[in-house]
Amino acid sequence: MRSTPAQWDRVYWEGKHLLMNLLDIEVPMISAINGPAWRHSEIPLLCDIVLAADDVQFQDSAHFPNGMVPGDGMHIIYPLLLGWNRGRYFLLTGQVLDAPKALELGLVNELLPRPDLLPRAWALAEQLAQRPSLLLRYTRVLFTQPLKRQLLDYLGYGLALEGMSVVDRTVTPDT
């Protein structure tokens, strides 16, 4: 699939705003990942508490293996969570991380059988909701500030480079 700069402009604009808007939510966020996280898994990983089904898998199948620069936030989130070398390896190789490995590496906080996933998320949400609103708000603001700075510095640049690769790419059967 080919794309023009004008078409990519919308992706660029939406990509920059989506992640920042999620980080602007001023209460702790909980994600419950109940299926394969192969595309845009940076979104649930932006949450403060990340729960996952015990059969979940993580992979960035959309970018480098498919001829695209992983510049839409993946290049920030995965090296941050996995460590610099491990994060780049994950993005460059199309590595699949199963649920136990994701827990071991710190991508997720808890693994649960699929039927228990949403009840656990609700239980945690109810537990957090008992805390004072200022405590919740300012803890979230404190936790998200370093990530916001990285996104401000590198997300637009990454999206621009991803756009260049999308406009230029030709996907071969080997990729």
Regions found by a protein language model. Name each.
Residues 1-17, 64-66:
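Glycine- (often His-adjacent) and acidic-residue-rich active-site loop
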Residues 12, 16, 38-39, 96, ...:
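Glycine-rich phosphate-binding loop at the start of an alpha helix
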Residues 18, 22-24, 32, 37-90, ...:
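CoA-thioester-processing core
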Residues 28, 44, 102, 139:
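Terminal peptide-recognition signature
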Residues 51-52, 108-120:
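Short acidic-hydrophobic, aromatic-tinged amphipathic segments that line or gate anion-handling sites
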Residues 55-56, 94, 114-115:
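Short secondary-structure boundary segments
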Residues 84-88, 97-104, 132:
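Short, structured loop/turn "capping" segments at alpha-beta junctions
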Residues 94-99, 119, 123-126, 130-175:
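C-terminal alpha-helix plus adjacent terminal tail
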